[in-house]
Amino acid sequence: MEGNPYLDRLYEMKVFGKWDPTEVEVRDPGLKDYICLKPMYLPHTGGRHAKKRFAKAEVPIVERLINRVMRTEKNTGKKHLAYNIVKRAFDIIHERTGENPIQVLVQALENAAPREETTTIIYGGISYHEAVDSSPQRRLDIALRLITEGAQQRAFRNPKPIEECLAEEIIAAARYDTECHSIRRKEEIERIAEAAR
């Protein structure tokens, strides 16, 4: 019996036509259910998840990165520009590491996701900070935000293009380099939470 040609094509789908998300491994058990590695030709779901609670866990992780890049200052609302930035950044990551850029991105997210943070509690008119564990969804949101903030800061008043800065930030976070913005901020968040116990 021959296989279904539609299903065969479906399983051959690669992000940007190059990178296979099915061979990516998520090592962090807390983030495993929230990092979506669904294969798709074009990482663009059109905001179908916007009104459903926890539905962003079903949005492919590459699209979530594109959406975060799109939300920064002069890139606001320009999805095609953000798409091209991430596409070129993935090419740079592959050139420098020789690995699947989606795997490098997943490692960077696992390393940049803070495990605990603080919340403000007001008791008897006095406010103080209390350490709390971060939910997996929030950990992923913070990691994406820190990585894109780091890339934006590297590119500001710098002749390097944003895609190169994004690639450098992702590679540095994947290697747990404490000089990069995302890892430095993550450690700062966890240090403040430890002091507030």
From Swiss-Prot:
Coiled coil regions, renumbered to chain: none
The UniProt record lists the keyword Hydrolase: no
Pfam families: Ribosomal_S7
InterPro entries (UniProt xref): Ribosomal_uS7, Ribosomal_uS7_arc, Ribosomal_uS7_CS, Ribosomal_uS7_dom, Ribosomal_uS7_dom_sf, Ribosomal_uS7_euk/arc
GO MF terms, alphabetically ordered: rRNA binding; structural constituent of ribosome
GO cellular component: small ribosomal subunit
Highest rank taxon of the organism: Archaea
PROSITE patterns cross-referenced by the UniProt entry: RIBOSOMAL_S7
An example Gene Ontology biological process: translation
UniProt KW keywords: Ribonucleoprotein, Ribosomal protein, RNA-binding, rRNA-binding
Family annotation (NCBIfam families): PRK04027.1 (NF003106), uS7_euk_arch (TIGR01028)
Family: Belongs to the universal ribosomal protein uS7 family.
Subunit structure comment from the entry: Part of the 30S ribosomal subunit.
HAMAP family assigned to the protein according to its UniProt record, in alphabetical order: Ribosomal_uS7_A
Function: One of the primary rRNA binding proteins, it binds directly to 16S rRNA where it nucleates assembly of the head domain of the 30S subunit. Is located at the subunit interface close to the decoding center.
Protein name: Small ribosomal subunit protein uS7
Natural source organism: Methanopyrus kandleri (strain AV19 / DSM 6324 / JCM 9639 / NBRC 100938)
Organism ancestry: Archaea, Methanobacteriati, Methanobacteriota, Methanomada group, Methanopyri
